[in-house]
Amino acid sequence: MYVKELFVDNFRNLQKQKIEFCEGINIFYGLNAQGKSNLLESIRLLSMGRSFRGSKTTELIKFGEDYFYVKAIICQENNDKKIEFGYKKNENKVIKVNGNKIKSTSELLGQLLTVIFSPEDLNIIKEGPSHRRKYLDSCISVVEKNYLYNLMQYNKILMNRNKLLKSIKEGKSKSILEIFDDQLVEYGAKIIVMRQNYLKNVEINIKKFLLEISNETAEIVYLNSVGLKDASDEEIVKKRLKEKLSKNIDVDLRYFTTQVGPHREDFKIIINGYDSRVYSSQGQQRTAALCLKLSEFEILKKETSEKPVLLLDDVMSELDENRKKYVLERLKGFQTFITHTTKRDLKGDCYFKISNGVVIKE
């Protein structure tokens, strides 16, 4: 799988243009704030249906305009596939695959497989549990077709349960709570099992990568909401989650929120026996984040039997020569997009200069 060409119109600061890419390593260079990251963002948008920077869809429109449109031609097994994403202010976004409009962004997942590497990856390690849950949900959604559906159903039931907790406090009967709990357990257990299985694969990869890069040991500890060391048996997880919800009801009623479940989970990356978020140096944390993304790439490749497209947004300047060489070696044979301030110290198959939103192929 690779991106043959990209067309952008009114996307961020990028000028209206069509760009043709190489199958190998594509280097985009130029000064800061010229549009390098915006180019990668447009490709990632066609892959995931949202900005990797966390921006709202309306914020992707070029200043002074009222719409944007992005289109890519993807080559997959010698067949071309067209993906389009358009949005106009105060209207619904329009996403099409081969000319057919899709109903939700969830249908877009898997059409263009990408892995994004950026300096913000460090936040997965350094910040709070919500960052790691969000990252985990994003990764699993691409390789497990039912994961996003289960997550959406769970969140909907969770919201209704929290509303009910407040109503009970105000005098409503507790009897209906059991119905919500059964539904929450049903979807929650599926989420927990999928997370457990995914993190097992992550651990295998991270152990290998960290040992090869810096000769350090690593393990993943899944802090699941049911208190199990191995939460891969769905029936056992259901039973434990139901017990936890029942046991915690008084606390839930006190705070009007559900205190137990996948929405409160976390995972730790342990380096040399210590929690990397708390005890590792920034260099170790950066290496852990890099290994996490390389693991995402390996799992995506294995589970889909496809070649994902790699997007490296200004990460090479953050790596020493040893890590830079290791990353490029791992990504050999895959279409890769790399943004950098200069082309001098990177070897690529195609070079593009970006200035004021104009992409010039050399």
Curated annotation (Swiss-Prot):
What GO molecular functions are on record for this protein? ATP binding; single-stranded DNA binding
> Biological process GO terms, please?
DNA replication; DNA synthesis involved in DNA repair; double-strand break repair; SOS response
Q: Which GO terms describe its cellular component?
A: cytoplasm
Q: Could you identify this protein by its name?
A: DNA replication and repair protein RecF
Q: Which InterPro entries match?
A: DNA-binding_RecF (IPR001238), DNA-binding_RecF_CS (IPR018078), P-loop_NTPase (IPR027417), RecF/RecN/SMC_N (IPR003395), RecF_2 (IPR042174)
Q: Give the principal location in a single coarse category.
A: cytoplasm
State where ATP binds. 30-37
- Spell out the subcellular localization from the entry: Cytoplasm
Q: Name the gene.
A: recF
Q: What does this protein do?
A: The RecF protein is involved in DNA metabolism; it is required for DNA replication and normal SOS inducibility. RecF binds preferentially to single-stranded, linear DNA. It also seems to bind ATP.
Recorded family membership: Belongs to the RecF family.
Record keywords: ATP-binding, Cytoplasm, DNA damage, DNA repair, DNA replication, DNA-binding, Nucleotide-binding, SOS response
